[in-house]
């Protein structure tokens, strides 16, 4: 009963909040056929891929930090640069038309932060706020799209999904971007600037459609030339089997875990692999490790993004749930790596397609490593 009233109270509070803020900030509208001279759109071409760069004079941005980001012109029109995602399962979303953007019905119920200068928005949906892979496929390549037209030195502030993780801070530092010239959408959800720049999505909202130019750009900015013998054979150890109760697997069906992870780790260690948890290292150190690797073995997941920084012809073995995507195999293809997969059906059905409790026989690993050219696996 208490929970019911709490939900009702929260609903009424949000509605009252929306009404009050609509008196402060006029609710945005869809632009009809007339031209909006406060918004410029530049066509950008990278390789054979077409993108758009948007420039707003005295525009504003509103985001809920997750599924909705609205770019609003000085004339209060919502731009096609806006993002409006709708979940189609427990974790995955699809982009919708601008007419489905929530600001059209709910307005912009947050006070504005004003920026006296040029602002480049790198917002890209909720996943890019926390996920290592999405940060490098959805966020960083937007800088390249902007650079096709303008010098990044012209930007005074960068509007980003988050700055709470070390890898975010470290990766931005390569551009000379630091805490002094970023605005986090986790803190400020409504901003206004003299000039706002935004781009279309680098891989068109599809993780499996990361482009070759994007991988080239990441390597130009970040790739290390280290050759550390210690890290020639890497096993990405998620170390998560300890989180589950093996006597009650159904309870953990939404996890992504190799049930025999310890057995796999022991086997790989016995043939010269070193076990690493990438998140325990700085981003520059991760770059050194993966650029030194000749073999990489790991479970489908964000840490596999580091394949983008491996040398040409590095051999990769990926454990992939049957419902997982092909984004890391695609990255390997673009980076010219040799990539094989062991596709595993979850022992217990998961509501999240790319997850599940998995088991991989050592014999399958031996066979795949042999096919990748490892002697005496």
Predicted regions and their residues:
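The feature primarily captures lumenal catalytic ectodomains
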Residues: 2-377
